[in-house]
Amino acid sequence: MRLIIEHKSKIEVFVGLFQLLKNWSSHITMNFEKDRLYIQLMDKSHICLADIEIKDKWFSFFECSCNNEISIDATHFAILLNYGLKHDKIELKYEDKGDIDKLYINYLNNNEIVNEKKKEGKGSFDHFYEINLIDIDKETLGIPKVDYDVDFTICSKKIMEVFTELNTFGENLNIKCSENIIELNSHGDTTKLKINIPVDDLNEYAIAEDEEINISFSLTHLCKMCLSMKMSSAINISLSSQYPMLLKYNLGDESSVSFYIAPKVFDD
């Protein structure tokens, strides 16, 4: 397996994704298939599920002759990837030779840019890292396709600001959706905050006929998922009283990062 990322914006997305996932689990299992990189990860509380698909066309180069499933320490991998932000190219390599259990992470630079920087005394050097793989048992969950009652698209930066503000008033978010408005509520022992979002202010909005949603989620987990707002300028949110909430970032090139969060269940 060998892949390359050359675009600076995509390097930031790729690095940012694993910076986020290191807070979910102590390890990450990556499935390299012939036409994609696939990751499924449950957070430590088992409340959130990440489902990530990055197609081969998203990368500058992607080559995988057979399916490879490898697991790595999430924190160490995120630390190594973070160094890639200083470089022009990230290369990941893995060879299934049985006795070699390593992933190779190479940070390379555009020669023309490097030569120009060297003239200014600012040359950057290529870096070559190795990280040991770990042996764990991993089961992939089947995620059924469902029809949600409410779907809307909103600016990812804006919804992060809203969730963060609500989180200062309480740990839980109550969402009410109707044909004309989305109402977000959070409260503590002595204070309460309500934020109304008119549907006209959304990029897209769809709700099933005569449907009204009233459901609650953990704001702590929602804020954690929305830390990945750099992945895309917009986020799609899907709701139903019968299914987990879906938050989906479109990365382009038929690639996406999806987060599922189970609703809060309160005792009567």
Spell out what each predicted region is.
Residues 1-22, 27-168, 174-268:
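DNA polymerase sliding clamps and clamp-related checkpoint/processivity subunits
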